[in-house]
């Protein structure tokens, strides 16, 4: 099918809905996962992974120091627009290749094996780092809640214990099958939206004092140690960019989604724009309610939004709203485990991981990649272990997440642009807007990848260093070393599924 001049990113009206199982066979894979997720569930998983109640709350303190209210609010508006371009461009390629492998499969088909290999490793380690970052963040917030409610001061050991319990919970929930995952993600959507409404509503109604609109939209604050305000504003954009990540989850769950060639693409785009609007409301509501800026920025709770709630609503009100945030983080981590495990399954299916024959196994009862789920949470646990000894280690885990996932989004889009008319779009496409939106997306990702690697505080020390560049180097070195070891075993299918070898391979992959 060739692109149409219709600029609207909607399915072409003259096309019949594809048989998704047959389409998957055409892409070279036997359907082994249960296709029980609807369009809303597919949107819900990306919305849950983006999780404005997780990202905005966790990095709000970073925003207070790095540009302040003006950069947080206007940065969110601007970054959201560019991220929407990335999502639109990625959704178009997803419609053409609706597989669990998602980004790396797209890159492999459009650019060759090496492109697919490096994209896959960036995406995989980014997803595993995201599980560690999200669930460890939830453990930190749980510690703040315990301190606020019962005066219990969390230690690195207790935080790690809570983190491991959360990981175990998410693993078990994902073993029950995609129907439960889809249900939890659907609940998560309304929990997030209702939570934002409740938090903002309470902060608007209850406190006697509010900041002026001039303060919220124009106040610039620099506590980074850097003198250049443009530089500070640029790195301040990372609050929004970090939050707007993980929307590739819709693509990773496409083999379990009905009408995936349309629903997965819609899921990506809807998750971004709904998060964009709701996140702006949340940030504005928090900022208007700040009672004492410096006290909030340096709060003993370690969680500035908790201090805003405490000052404006009292201990009981703050505890209740903090609990809403913690539950939202749990929804977020559960969705991330689902996405990461599908990536592990798909990458193993194509022979890219050590012990691939183990990790690609699918339960015949629940039709879920059981071994991939356990591997995902186990690696996430290992990534977070250094946090027992250093708070800086948590920053490094976050760096692995963002520096892995962010460039991986742009690679399939760049290769699609390079392919030109050789690219055959699916039923969901951008028409004549494909190239301008695509180049905007690639340019933005290139810019923010550089921003992610810049030092965020001065002077640069072991404790303040930005480890994103180190994480990127480590990922690329590991991927290169393993390429020379495993390149003979790795490969996406070059023909439709149905050969005797393929059937034998997958017969032993069902447990």
List the predicted regions and their residue ranges.
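Hydrophobic transmembrane alpha-helices that form the core helical bundles
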Residues: 58-59, 65, 75, 84-167, ...
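Transmembrane helix-loop boundary segments of multi-pass membrane transporters
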Residues: 62-72, 146-157, 178-189, 320-324, ...
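Terminal cytosolic tails of multi-pass membrane transporters
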Residues: 1-37, 413-437, 455-511
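Membrane-interface loop-to-helix entry segments
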Residues: 158-210, 215, 245, 268-273, ...
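Helix-loop-helix connectors at the membrane interface of multi-pass transporters/channels
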Residues: 104-109, 114, 135-161, 195-198, ...
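Transmembrane helix-loop junctions in multi-pass membrane proteins
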Residues: 55-60, 173-178, 316-317, 379-396, ...
